[in-house]
Amino acid sequence: MYAIIQAGGAGTRLKTISGDLPKVMVEICGKPILEWQIESLKKSGIHDFLVIISKNGKPISDYCGDGKKFGVNISYIVEESPLGTAGGLYFAQDIIKDDFVLCFGDLMLDVDWTRFHHFHKEKGAALTAFAHPNSHPFDSDLLVANEEEKIIKIDSKNNVRDYYYQNLTNAGLYICSKEVLDFVASPTKIDFEKVVLKHFIEEGKAYAYRSSEYVKDCGTPDRFYSVENDLKNGIIHGKSLANPQKCIFLDRDGTINKYNGLVTKPDELELMDDTSSAIKKINASKYLAICITNQPVIARGDVTLEELKNIHNKMETLLGKEGAYLDGLYFCPHHPDKGFEGEVPEFKIECDCRKPRIGLLKKAEARYNIDLNKSWFIGDTDRDIQTGINAGCRTIFLDTTPNPPIRFKDAKPDFVCHSLSEAVNLILNSERDNHD
C-alpha cells in the first residue's frame, strides 16, 4: 500500500520555530515531522511513499532523497502552483492502483495502520477518515456518523449548535480507495474535505474510524511545544494501538452523572461536580477513559436508541465544554425479565453484555487493544465491582449513591473512594509511585 503525504505547506504559523523551512521539516526531538510520519507508516509495512511538495520543497527532497536511508521508497509530486489539499492527487492516478493512505504534513502521530486498513476493508469504504474525540469540540468541525460508523454529514464549527452533539472530530488522516483518485478529474485547486470527502459522504461511501491513538496538528508554536512534550513523555508512541493499552472503565449513572433513577431524557442527565476535571486527568495520562453502562430503558420501552444517543450526546457536549472527553462509550440495551407493558421484545433477552457480564469490556478490549489486567473499573454499585473482577481489572467503589442495592455481596473492591476525582488521583498517583 502507498502513502501520500501532503507536504506542500509553507508553515507560516510556525515561522518563529521553523524559519524558512517547510513545516514538515521542523524538527521535534531531533527528527523532522515527516520522518516521524514515515517511521510510523513503515512499522505497519508501508514502504512506498508519494510526497507532494511545492516548488519550494527542495529542502524536503534533499533531506529524504529516494527514501533508501529510511528503508522505504519515496517519489515526489511537485506542484508548480498551489493545488489545495486534493488537486495534487490527480498526478498519482497512474502510479497508485489500490488503497492508499493520505496524510497531511503537519500531523504528529503514531497509528496502527494495519488495524486502520482492516476497518476500511471490512466496511467496504471508498474513503475512511481517522476520527477521534478532542478537548475542544465546541470550536471544531465534527463528523456525524451512524451506528454502522458511516459518515452522514459534517457538522461545521460555524453552525449555531443549539443541540447536543457527539464529540467526533476529523483528524486529517485517511485511507482511500482508487475511486478517490479517479474522482480528482483535473489538476486544479481542490479542497479535500469540502469537495472530495463531501462527495463520498453523499454517495454513502465514507466511514469514520474512531480511535484513541495520537494524531495531533502541530502547526502552531503552542501545539508544537505540547506535542514535543508528549513525545518526550512517551505518550505518542504509547497510544498506538499496536501496543497494549491501559484503561479506566467508568460506570455512567452515579459515577459520571448524578444518580437520578432511570434517565429517560437529556434534561435528567447532570454531571457530577468533579466529573470533567477527573476525566481530563485521565485524558492527559496514559490511560483510556471508556464508559460501560447498562441501559435497560431501551428494553423497557422508555426510550428509543435514537433518544439514548441524544442523552449520551448531552454527556459528551457537557464534557467537551470543560475540555474532557471519553475515548469510547458502550451500553447494554437488554434486560432478561419479560412480560411488562410497553417492553421491546427484541431487547428482552439474556445477553453477554449486561453487567456484570463482560461482553462490553471484551468489545472495547478488541477495538482498543486493551490489557484488562492493567486496567481499572470504577463504579457506584457492587454490580460494577463484580464486572471489574470478572474482567480481571482492579476496582474502585464510589460511595456516591445513597443505599445502593446489594446484589453481589461477595464483590469486594480493591479501594473505596468518595468521588471520581479521588479515585482517578489514586490510580494516577499509584502509577507514578510504581515508576519512581
Language model segments and positions:
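Active-site neighborhood of HAD-like aspartate-dependent phosphohydrolases
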Residues: 245-289
